[in-house]
A protein has these predicted regions:
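Two-component histidine kinase transmitter core
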Residues: 51, 200-205
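Two-component histidine phosphotransfer core
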Residues: 1-182
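A short beta-strand-to-loop micro-motif at the C-terminal edge of the catalytic HATPase_c
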Residues: 183-192
Length: 205
């Protein structure tokens, strides 16, 4: 059950990534194609390795998310920048998290937050500790959750709600296994959206 819930990397992302590599080759931009392919291969390896684990070091999870953001930024013509920040008090090697549990929210920030935005956008992924919880927050300065959805070519219908449902199920399992609260909440900002995912602090033995 847990493994099925973890296997949620969007097949459309993989399809789009391969299309981007093909486009670089066709435009005779081999350096870009090689760089993109290297990052894509690294992400796929991390996803496959991490999907076998119920928890992975925060450092590994953030590396996968960084690769994902890098690829989506390149694929979309660099229409957004991104920042990943971690509270220096957090040991990224010893702190464990469910792999890619925040990826659907990062994806939503890109596909929906950035899709209808005029000009360049920014996405921030931040990690901090709050009492005995780890807070992973995704914030964008995009159009907001209540703006009319702009359909993106290749995007599956109801993908957002499905990803949210899967993530909720994963967090419910974490809560059941750890016996401590785990969940997420949306915060509507004057410009954009913030999602906070709260997890019980889990550290390597």
């Amino acid at each position: 059950e847990t493994q099925a819930l973890r296997s949620q990397m969007n097949p459309h992302f993989i399809f789009n990534a391969l299309n981007s590599i093909s486009a670089y080759v066709q435009k005779n931009e081999p350096d870009k194609a090689v760089g993109y392919l290297g990052k894509f291969a690294r992400l796929m390896r991390l996803v496959l390795e991490n999907s076998r684990q119920s928890e992975v070091p925060l450092k590994d999870d953030l590396e996968a998310l960084d690769a994902y953001l890098h690829l989506e930024r390149a694929r979309g013509g660099e229409k957004f920048d991104y920042t990943i920040t971690v509270d220096p008090a957090i040991d990224q090697e010893d702190t464990l998290v469910p792999p890619l549990v925040v990826q659907p929210f990062v994806e939503n920030a890109i596909w929906h937050g950035m899709a209808g935005k005029e000009g360049k956008g920014h996405i921030t992924l931040s990690v901090k500790r709050r009492a005995d919880e780890l807070i992973m927050a995704i914030e964008d300065d995009g159009v907001g959750r209540h703006a009319p959805k702009k359909m993106v070519e290749g995007e599956p219908v109801k993908k957002t709600s499905l990803a949210t449902t899967i993530t909720q199920a994963r967090l419910d399992l974490v809560q059941k296994q750890k016996g401590r609260p785990a969940g997420f909440k949306y915060i509507d900002l004057p410009q954009g959206t913030r999602v906070e995912v709260s997890l019980p602090i889990s550290e390597a033995a």
